[in-house]
A protein has these predicted regions:
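Mature catalytic core of soluble alpha/beta enzymes
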Residues: 2-17, 28-354
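Hydrophobic h-region of N-terminal signal peptides that target proteins for export
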Residues: 22-28
Length: 354
């Protein structure tokens, strides 16, 4: 694969215009805006919208996200999901929102053969990613807990769900995407035609910037303490021009721990093995119309790797993807050729064609 020439000088003007957010970088709209920043779903969030009714719309969207957090938190003992997870196999009637996520998650678990699995809470908790009491579980303990993640044992009867005792859902890989979709709907219903949502690094775009041009956003450099490439740590390695879509990235560069054996373990687990993913991917980004779909695919693509993601992309045809690898190389789908600009020197560039 060809080495990419350094484009620092050529694109300095673009890089200076980028505003850093938590997981992505967004070029702000210069017209009048209304913005609200708050904490929900265990992360910082910002909603920016533009238009006559933007202040009211932002508050309504914020309220919806707060309401969803009360439904979907796996650790809040007052949440609906917590109640379901502790229903001890008895019938439970979920809300519309919770039912949507359960059915979506179970469907995707079936499609991926359990690689993506919304029932990994017992395993995630054992690793300490939920409690932050990190530890390296024994192989025997992982195998024992995997018995509690069999998505085929969960079933609906009329409006009720039956979740076997000891099993527990965790929608950390879906919740923010779903919340973004719901917030976008509220903004649109209130007459907003242009908005940017940053939900803990999940970016969702409504319409175009100023109603006329694409938004410029940039992916965060996924490399941590040691950088195997020439990419400058903390830089903006690439920019995208997009509108009316979700841009969601999965990576192990923010949530991880180093065990006593000196090995780094990231929070993204392969549902089939119960172990953190180790496949050379530093980050995987999905661009799709729907935030829930993009959230699911960003995690799934990170787990399955480039070739399996390529197969899904070729078959589905309704998303684009970018993968940055630990060796400093980059691969991205051909639908992004006219939308992506590399701002840093990658060790290699691959454009994936159908």
């Amino acid at each position: 694969m060809p080495t990419i020439a350094n484009q620092h000088k050529t694109w300095n003007f673009i890089k200076r215009s980028l505003l850093l957010f938590i997981g992505l970088i967004i070029v702000g709209c210069k017209s009048q805006e209304n913005s609200i920043t708050f904490q929900s779903m265990d992360t910082a969030m910002t909603i920016k919208s533009f238009g006559k009714n933007s202040k009211k719309a932002n508050l309504l969207a914020q309220k919806k996200i707060f309401d969803l957090d009360k439904i979907l938190s796996a650790v809040d003992n007052q949440s609906e999901l917590y109640a379901l997870n502790h229903s001890c196999g008895k019938k439970f009637k979920p809300s519309y929102e919770l039912e949507c996520l359960i059915k979506f998650g179970l469907e995707k678990a079936e499609i991926t053969g359990g690689a993506f699995n919304p029932l990994l809470f017992p395993v995630t908790y054992e690793w300490g990613f939920t409690s932050k009491n990190f530890k390296l579980p024994s192989k025997e303990r992982i195998e024992e807990l995997l018995l509690l993640t069999d998505y085929k044992k969960v079933f609906f009867e009329d409006e009720n769900i039956f979740l076997p005792e000891g099993m527990a859902f965790d929608f950390g890989a879906l919740g923010k995407g779903f919340a973004g979709d719901e917030a976008i709907k509220i903004l649109a219903d209130n007459g907003i035609e242009s908005a940017v949502l940053d939900l803990g690094g999940n970016i969702q775009l409504l319409g175009k910037k100023n109603g006329t041009e694409n938004w410029k956003i940039g992916l965060r450099n996924p490399f941590g303490g040691t950088d195997p490439s020439d990419i400058v740590q903390g830089s903006v390695p690439l920019a995208l021009e997009l509108s009316d879509c979700a841009v969601i990235t999965s990576g192990g560069y923010e949530r991880y721990f180093t065990a006593d054996n000196g090995k780094k373990y990231i929070h993204i687990l392969d549902g089939r093995s119960g172990y953190p993913v180790e496949n050379g991917i530093a980050s995987s980004t999905i661009i799709a119309k729907n935030g829930l779909y993009a959230d699911y695919l960003s995690t799934t693509s990170f787990i399955l790797g480039k070739e399996e993601t390529r197969k899904i992309w070729e078959k589905a045809g309704d998303f684009e993807f970018i993968m940055i690898f630990s060796d400093g190389s980059i691969s991205y789908s051909s639908g992004l050729k006219d939308k992506i600009t590399l701002l840093e020197k990658f060790t290699a560039e691959e454009i994936i064609e159908k």
